[in-house]
């Protein structure tokens, strides 16, 4: 692995940072409507880099305005790129001012690109013996790498020295230009040689050498072993001019005339009064407070600035990154005395992080192999209890370790933090330990801060927040069929890995928690919804649900027969046999042999046979309709009727789904193994699957389902008098809407008119256009638009809400639920019209869907609290969409159903009544 020498010259590709930040961070604005997201992102990245390496010399280099020498060489150079978005352009000048106020030299040289300036400074520094660290995400910079010049990509925390360049690109740094010249570079519109891709370019360069050698000895190319080698010499000959033009375009200049030398790029102390003014103007409130309190952490060796300044610490960066993640203060505990000593330390800590190590991802089946703890950054311990490889040292027995730890783990007053603690709670339950004092979960902290900012697993969060690449499980256990389980891993490696998990978790919490505390709404959601939900979901998962395999087996046999009938029908329509599961064969049948006009194409250019396309084609052609039914049944068979019996846990005789709190953008729960959300709701096949979810003897399944909850939330949010009145009076909302839209008395509304009104009601929740409504109702677009216009005339509050929400989303970059959950919309200001329109639709729907998610989560918490206190033999067994499902003893049915109904309808207050429909039966279908 590359070691970064002390105090390197840091050269930052500012233009690369700018675009990356613009696309990676939410489109934030200040109260004046000025965009700030890219500025915030660049400063975040710069700050982390400078504070991690603390250089005495650095520069941030941007592209200058105007054309460069490459534009003169090739008129199409970068010509495919869209113009810089206005909201990004507006941030450049203030960003430059902030970079300078941070004390960092800033360069932009006309006629060349930032890469050329960086290349020149890097080579100059190398000549005088100074190590260089270039921060960039651009692959063409790899040509500059030497033993003294290293690249770092702060977005992925990847560091490239000469060996890493070879591993990544297949060629050494000195052949990167040749590599790009041959294969081209689509990001810069460098053409390359037609027909030469990455693999071919690697084969040519590895086999013979650079471009000059290839053209000097073309006869040797045919002797290489890659596919197409025999004709490659001819292709190269035909495109020699293009190859050498591409070579020139890809070459980074290292002889740009500069007014400054690398030794003059000294990092100065921040100019606090300038930073303060800029931070206040653009409303970087936390940074403003840091400047005012004098906490800006300067780089070591910084020279005094010409103006008075204060020092600022930005709390998202690790205070001592090198020490905090050095592993020096990690211990492996092998005896009772040391463990008891650590338990005392853990009791006294304001909060400690802990993690379990096991031999399975299934927490019910998992065996505990060890536990790790961290009490402060960089101070962590691992307690192995079941490593059983040959010559493994003696360890504290699992029984003894848990006996010592149980009082601590069950103490409600001792606050704990973890990453996905629901899993660890489940593991400990296998050994009779009820984990209490669950105060924080870093996965949920990240999710609540921004659900769409990226993945919320520990490795990703460590990269993003700590700029630290964690030890991965594959690093210590290997891959594939020979991968070890954790109990087989040597303690030296296992201890470091496990202790790091706890250490990183604690450090992540210390970084994210102050950020979360600054936002009242998200903090409320975290403290009062997501964290209390963790033990509730853990209980629901452990309860599981009883499945009748015989029902599923019979259903599967029937589906098999129906699939055979559909296959024959499809063959008859097509006039020949073909594989209905083969996309390629289906494309041939539909679009070539039947002559149907393709509606869409795949990214690869082939005609699409997606479900959406087939649904549209099915309106006019019989075969797509058959294919859709075949696909739907085949998926049900493979996902549910065949698979569910295999998921029955041999220990419990039940199926235990896993619920995920940190997956969807809106706050909805998702589930896997099995995915309960995808069981069809309104067709016979879905009903048949639900019939296999059964109650044990003397029990019944009880289903409690919120009725039309998102429409009710729409009424509350829009404050539309017509909708509020209809719900308050308990009217059939779809019939009431039809009466308003069509100008009829309620009792004159036909079934068809009610269906149209229902499509409008639910369509508007999801931002449906007139075109979408016309397709759904199979009516002309003008007629659909007329329906929508009539709707908005009758319910003007809904239109006002939609317009208001779109405007707020564009201004803030996010929308909120009633509880304060923030739902960020990165594409709300996208220059891509389709992506922008999608974000606008999401802006309308997200507050409703997110509020519905918050409501059912509050209901789960309220019902669970009652069950734990008063009804221990009632089990909550599933949560699906807006529905909670229970197992209730027959003797308790009436009282329990009534209380669940009350708790769910009153768990939150909105301006229309929440309506819960409760049913019961021997199986889920009967109860639903």
Swiss-Prot record:
GO MF annotation: an example: 5'-3' exonuclease activity
Disulfide bonds: none
PROSITE patterns recorded: DNA_POLYMERASE_A
Keywords attached to this entry: DNA damage, DNA repair, DNA replication, DNA-binding, DNA-directed DNA polymerase, Exonuclease, Hydrolase, Nuclease, Nucleotidyltransferase, Transferase
GO terms, biological process: DNA-templated DNA replication; double-strand break repair
Catalytic activity as recorded in UniProt: DNA(n) + a 2'-deoxyribonucleoside 5'-triphosphate = DNA(n+1) + diphosphate
Enzyme Commission number: 2.7.7.7
Family: Belongs to the DNA polymerase type-A family.
Record function comment: In addition to polymerase activity, this DNA polymerase exhibits 3'-5' and 5'-3' exonuclease activity. It is able to utilize nicked circular duplex DNA as a template and can unwind the parental DNA strand from its template.
Subunit annotation: Single-chain monomer with multiple functions.
NCBIfam families xref list: pola (TIGR00593), PRK05755.1 (NF004397)
Name the UniProt record assigns to this protein: DNA polymerase I
Gene this protein is translated from: polA
């Amino acid at each position: 692995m590359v070691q970064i020498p002390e105090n390197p010259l840091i050269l930052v590709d500012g233009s690369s940072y700018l675009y990356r930040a613009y696309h990676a961070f939410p489109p934030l604005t200040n109260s004046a409507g000025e965009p700030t997201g890219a500025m915030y992102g660049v400063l975040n990245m710069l700050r982390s880099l400078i504070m991690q390496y603390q250089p005495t010399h650095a520069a941030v280099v941007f592209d200058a305005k105007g054309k460069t020498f490459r534009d003169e060489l090739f008129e199409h150079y970068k010509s495919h790129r869209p113009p810089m978005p206005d909201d990004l352009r507006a941030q450049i000048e203030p960003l430059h001012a902030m970079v300078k106020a941070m004390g960092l030299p800033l360069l932009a040289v006309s006629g060349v690109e930032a890469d050329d300036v960086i290349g020149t400074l890097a080579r100059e520094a190398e000549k005088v013996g100074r190590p260089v660290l270039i921060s960039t995400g651009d692959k063409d910079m790899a040509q500059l790498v030497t033993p003294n010049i290293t690249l770092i990509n702060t977005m992925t925390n990847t560091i490239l020295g000469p060996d890493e360049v070879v591993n990544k690109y297949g060629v050494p740094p000195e052949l990167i230009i040749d590599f790009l010249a041959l294969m081209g570079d689509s990001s810069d519109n460098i053409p390359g040689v037609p027909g030469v891709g990455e693999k071919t370019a690697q084969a040519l360069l590895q086999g013979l050498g650079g471009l000059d050698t290839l053209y000097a000895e073309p006869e040797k190319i045919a002797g290489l072993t890659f596919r197409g080698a025999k004709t490659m010499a001819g292709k190269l000959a035909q495109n020699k001019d293009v190859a050498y033009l591409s070579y020139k375009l890809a070459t980074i200049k290292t002889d740009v005339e500069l007014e400054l030398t690398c030794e003059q790029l000294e990092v100065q102390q921040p100019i606090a009064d300038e930073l303060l003014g800029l931070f206040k103007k653009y409303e970087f409130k936390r940074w403003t407070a840091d400047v005012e309190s004098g906490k800006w952490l300067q780089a070591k060796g910084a020279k005094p600035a010409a103006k008075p300044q204060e020092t600022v610490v930005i709390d998202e960066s690790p205070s001592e990154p090198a020490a905090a993640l050095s592993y020096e203060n990690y211990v492996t505990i092998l005896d009772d005395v040391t463990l008891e000593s650590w338990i005392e330390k853990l009791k006294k800590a304001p909060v400690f992080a802990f993690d379990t190590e096991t031999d399975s991802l299934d927490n019910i089946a998992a065996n505990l192999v060890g536990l790790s703890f961290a009490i402060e950054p960089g101070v962590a311990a691992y307690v192995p209890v079941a490593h059983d490889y040959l010559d493994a040292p003696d360890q504290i027995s699992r029984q003894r370790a848990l006996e010592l730890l149980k009082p601590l783990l069950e103490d409600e007053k001792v606050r704990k933090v973890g990453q996905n603690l629901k899993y660890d709670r489940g593991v400990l339950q296998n050994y009779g330990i009820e984990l209490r004092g669950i105060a924080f979960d870093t996965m949920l902290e990240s999710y609540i801060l921004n659900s769409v900012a990226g993945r919320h697993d520990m490795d990703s969060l460590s990269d993003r927040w700590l700029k630290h690449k964690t030890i991965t499980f594959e690093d210590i256990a290997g891959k594939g069929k020979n991968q070890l389980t954790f109990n087989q891993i040597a303690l030296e490696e296992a201890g470091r890995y496990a202790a790091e998990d706890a250490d990183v978790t604690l450090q992540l919490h210390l970084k994210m928690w102050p950020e979360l505390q600054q936002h009242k709404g998200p903090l409320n959601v975290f403290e009062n919804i997501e964290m209390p939900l963790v033990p509730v979901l853990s209980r629901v998962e452990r309860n599981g649900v009883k499945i009748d395999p015989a029902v599923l087996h019979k259903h599967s046999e029937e589906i098999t027969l129906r699939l055979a009938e559909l296959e024959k029908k499809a063959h008859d329509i097509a006039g020949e046999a073909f594989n209905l599961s083969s996309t390629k064969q289906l494309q041939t049948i539909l679009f070539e042999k039947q002559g149907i006009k393709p509606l869409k194409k795949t990214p690869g250019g082939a005609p699409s046979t997606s479900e959406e396309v087939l649904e549209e084609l099915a309106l006019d052609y019989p075969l797509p309709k058959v294919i859709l039914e075949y696909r739907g049944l085949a998926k049900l068979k493979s996902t549910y009727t065949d698979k569910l019996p295999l998921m029955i846990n041999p220990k419990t005789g039940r199926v235990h789904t896993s619920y995920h709190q940190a997956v969807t953008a809106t706050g909805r729960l998702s589930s896997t193994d099995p995915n309960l959300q995808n069981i069809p709701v309104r067709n016979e096949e879905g009903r048949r699957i639900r019939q296999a979810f059964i109650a044990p003897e003397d029990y019944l399944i009880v289903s409690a389902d919120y009725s039309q909850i998102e429409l009710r939330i729409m009424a509350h949010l829009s404050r539309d008098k017509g909708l509020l009145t209809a719900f308050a009076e308990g009217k059939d909302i779809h019939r009431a809407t039809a009466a308003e839209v069509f100008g009829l008395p309620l009792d004159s509304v036909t079934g068809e008119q009610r269906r149209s009104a229902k499509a409008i009601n639910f369509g508007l929740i999801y931002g449906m256009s007139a075109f979408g409504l016309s397709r759904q109702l199979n009516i002309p677009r003008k007629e659909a638009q007329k329906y929508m216009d009539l709707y908005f005339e009758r319910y003007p509050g809904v239109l006002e809400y939609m317009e208001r929400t779109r405007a707020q989303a564009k201004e803030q970059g996010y929308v909120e639920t009633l509880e304060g959950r923030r739902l960020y919309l990165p594409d709300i200001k996208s220059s891509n019209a389709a992506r922008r329109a999608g974000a606008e639709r999401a802006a309308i729907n997200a507050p409703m869907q997110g509020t519905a998610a918050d409501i059912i989560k509050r209901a789960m918490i309220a019902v669970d609290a009652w069950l734990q206190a008063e009804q221990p033999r009632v089990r909550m067994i599933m949560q699906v969409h807006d529905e909670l499902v229970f197992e209730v003893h027959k003797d308790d049915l009436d009282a329990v159903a009534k209380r669940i109904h009350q708790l769910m309808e009153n768990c939150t207050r909105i301006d229309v009544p929440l309506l819960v429909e409760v049913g019961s039966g021997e199986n889920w279908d009967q109860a639903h």
